[in-house]
Amino acid sequence: MKEETMEVVCQSGALAGTELPVKEMIDQAFEAMGKAYVPYSGFKVGAALLSAEGTLYQGCNIENAAYTPSNCAERTAFFKAVSQGEKEFKAICIVGGKEGIPTGLTAPCGVCRQVMMEFCDPETFQIILAAEREEYKIFYLKELLPMGFGPKNL
């Protein structure tokens, strides 16, 4: 029987003192990636968003022929969760790759980072970028959106 291990590479001590269902989040993100609608780029992205209450929300990217109306996996997950009444979140897991085959780490775009800033504390919200099911890195939002502008600035 093969022993399963998770290679965890954390930035700034991410995960310290927290309990995240990392394996389940990665599995959910991979499942969501399989649902992506990407007839133009072929680049599939899946996300699994963890609410403060422990509920996981999946999101996938959805492309459109006009490109601008396309939506990223991360925003799909956030909008789904918010439309269900969630407003507080702990973490998100993101996985992506051409034709659904992971090609390294897939980081959120600037628009998705800004949506995260709207609902999440940049000091504590964690972003899991998975290259494979056993290979991932975890960042705090503040690391991916330094000097971010959010609700506290208004």
Task: Please name every model-derived segment.
Residues Q28-E31, A73-A81:
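Short, well-ordered amphipathic alpha-helical segments that serve as non-catalytic structural scaffolds
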Residues V38-P39:
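Short Gly/Pro-enriched turn/cap motifs at secondary-structure boundaries
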Residues G42-L50:
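Short beta-strand scaffold segments in enzyme catalytic cores
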Residues N61-R75:
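Compact, glycine-rich, soluble single-domain proteins
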